[in-house]
């Protein structure tokens, strides 16, 4: 095996063409075996193996710096930079993350997980090199739809006039997660169809030199192209056309479905565990399709992905012009939603909580200053969802619940989630953001209302005395479970579902203060700036009530085990009940 002998990129630089082909086959087999066991971003990585071998053959990493956009396609890079053990030894499969990680290797220049950032990051490295009088090559590898992001275009605009060594490898596999959209990608297709000679060339228009490689899975052609641009004295783009999912028939036939995949049987491609449908996503898809049929002015927006609700290709086709994929451009999607709402349409833009972070300014300025009644659906909002530091979904409450004019709601059941969605789309007074539950009540413990226009009205789920548990969104169930624990100890706790994250039910809080001396807030997010601190601030001005805020501290967590993290911060029902008993002694 070649991989067992590779400890750094220098180990492959003396390889012959045949050895490189054998190495690529070995890497591809290792990737397929590993992903079949633990899952991961298999499609992008299978398509970039030859380019990674060529990059590490030509360039001298880590002296020459290679920045991976998104970095979900870094598995082959990790194989060649001292981490092959994590791809060939099943016992060590989990030793490395799925993204570049500066804690793992000096060959990983940044911790990256969001799209369209590599050109900007690398441009800073290039400028710093020039200021220091360095001579290393700076390479930004970008693809998988990331070129449609505004930051990528802003970066192109800057590097076009750097006048110094800067190499962009554009990995063109004609895919984002789903299909690419937009005029830019039509022009990229023209470049592919003309062997890179089409007159409309974005990169040349931005002031960069341009080199085209028709077969981006031909290692020798790539080595020739990279050798040609190595040590260049001006910015250059090497446009390589790759085959996403190369070498695995299932991934080649269904690049969207195999962008990222759960563990699977290699022979059949069937997942090893049956996928458990997300009831919230399924109900949301049904709602979107139903609303589109009834309301010709309804539009669902996505940004290069289907927003965590799993709109199938057939669903997207059925929506027709009522579905708009803006590419990986969340900021644009939010502003477009504002324009749609101002123009009389009824838009929903849905994406993951982690990606909504990119849209703060548009949400504040373009939407909320203008009071545009657009609807935004945040998914993946839980410490129990993605555990990689680049994709955490529990900062959104602190970020968005404090924007004036934005009504942010956290429903707690499928029935309530759809009721809130329906109200949000039908009303035309407020910008509304909805935190789609990750988990929640199987059956709603109280009657679900249909009108949420009387803002900030919380729901008393059960009545008690002395102890009040306020469970936010996903943690509404946790509040009820903690109340059950306390009931077994003879304490009847009151449980409240606030529903609204952007404001307080001050009348209810004042009323509850009369017969409750201990109040606990539980939220699936960070405490600082969160809902619980709003409650603490409210009672802090009055005195006489002790408030304890439960949630996560303001820090980044990486590759954690959710249950362990929850226990660390006492986010389990037995721990919460024990804390209450201790406080009441």
Model-derived segments and spans:
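Cofactor-binding active-site loop characterized by glycine-rich and histidine/acidic residues
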Residues: 41-162, 298, 312-313, 453
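Peripheral docking tails and interdomain loops at the edges
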Residues: 263-267, 271-274, 385-387, 407, ...
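Glycine-rich ThDP/TPP pyrophosphate-binding loop and its adjacent helix/strand module
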Residues: 108-264, 270-273, 277, 284, ...
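Glycine/charged-rich beta-loop-alpha catalytic/anionic-binding loops adjacent to active sites
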Residues: 29-36, 95-111, 133-139, 313-327, ...
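N-terminal amphipathic, basic-rich helices that act as targeting or association modules
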Residues: 1-79, 215
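A short, small-residue-rich loop immediately preceding and capping a beta-strand
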Residues: 38-40, 64-67, 111, 132-149, ...
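A glycine-rich helix N-cap at a beta->alpha junction
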Residues: 86-96, 161-173, 368-380
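Non-catalytic terminal/interface segments that mediate subunit docking, oligomerization
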Residues: 248-372, 471-473
């Amino acid at each position: 095996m070649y991989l067992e002998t590779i400890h750094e990129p220098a180990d492959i630089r003396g390889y012959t063409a045949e050895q490189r082909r054998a190495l690529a086959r070995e890497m591809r087999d290792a990737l397929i075996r590993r992903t079949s066991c633990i899952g991961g971003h298999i499609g992008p990585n299978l398509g970039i193996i030859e380019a990674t071998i060529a990059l590490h053959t030509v360039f001298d990493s880590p002296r020459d710096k290679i920045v991976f956009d998104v970095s979900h396609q870094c598995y082959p890079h990790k194989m060649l930079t001292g981490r092959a053990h994590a791809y060939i030894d099943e016992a060590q499969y989990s030793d490395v993350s799925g993204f570049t990680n500066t804690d793992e290797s000096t060959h990983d220049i940044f911790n990256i997980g969001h799209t369209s950032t590599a050109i900007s990051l690398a441009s800073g490295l290039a400028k710093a090199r020039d200021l220091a009088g360095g001579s290393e090559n700076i390479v930004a590898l970008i693809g998988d739809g990331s070129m449609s992001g505004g930051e990528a275009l802003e970066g192109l605009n800057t590097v076009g006039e750097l006048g110094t060594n800067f190499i962009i490898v554009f990995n063109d596999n004609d895919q984002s997660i789903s299909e690419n959209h937009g005029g830019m990608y039509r022009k990229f297709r023209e470049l592919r169809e003309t062997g890179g000679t089409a007159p409309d060339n974005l990169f040349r228009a931005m002031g960069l030199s341009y080199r085209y490689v028709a077969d981006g899975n031909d290692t020798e052609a790539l080595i020739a192209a990279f050798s040609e641009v190595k040590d260049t004295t001006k910015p250059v783009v090497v446009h390589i056309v790759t085959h996403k999912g190369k070498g695995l028939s299932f991934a080649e036939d269904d690049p969207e479905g195999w962008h990222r995949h759960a563990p699977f049987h290699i022979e059949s491609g069937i997942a090893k565990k049956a996928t458990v449908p997300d009831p919230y996503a399924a109900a949301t898809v049904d709602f979107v399709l139903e609303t589109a049929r009834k309301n010709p002015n309804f539009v669902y927006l996505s940004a290069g992905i289907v927003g965590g609700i799993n709109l199938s290709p057939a669903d997207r086709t059925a929506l027709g012009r009522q579905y708009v994929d803006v590419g990986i451009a969340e900021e644009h999607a939010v502003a477009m939603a504002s324009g749609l709402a101002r123009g009389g349409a009824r838009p929903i833009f849905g994406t993951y909580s982690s990606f909504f972070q990119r849209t703060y300014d548009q949400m504040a300025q373009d939407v909320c200053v203008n009071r545009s009644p657009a609807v935004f659906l945040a998914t993946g909002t839980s410490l129990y969802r993605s555990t990689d530091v680049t994709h955490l979904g529990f900062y959104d409450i602190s970020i968005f619940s404090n924007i004036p004019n934005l009504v942010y709601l956290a429903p707690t059941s499928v029935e309530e989630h759809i009721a809130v969605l329906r109200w949000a789309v039908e009303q035309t007074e407020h910008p509304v953001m909805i935190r789609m539950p990750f988990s929640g009540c199987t059956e709603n413990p109280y009657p679900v209302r249909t009108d949420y226009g009387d803002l900030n009205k919380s729901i008393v789920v059960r009545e008690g005395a002395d102890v009040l548990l306020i469970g936010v969104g996903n943690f509404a169930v946790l509040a009820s479970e903690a109340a059950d624990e306390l009931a077994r100890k003879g304490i009847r706790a009151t449980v409240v579902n606030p529903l609204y994250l952007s404001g307080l039910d001050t009348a209810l809080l004042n009323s509850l203060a009369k017969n409750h001396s201990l109040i606990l807030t539980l939220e699936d997010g960070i405490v600082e700036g969160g809902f619980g601190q709003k409650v603490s601030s409210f009672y802090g001005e009055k005195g006489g009530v002790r408030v304890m805020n439960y949630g996560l501290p303001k820090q980044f967590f990486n590759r954690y085990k959710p249950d362990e993290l929850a226990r660390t911060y006492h986010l389990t029902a037995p721990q919460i009940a024990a804390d209450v008993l201790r406080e009441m002694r």
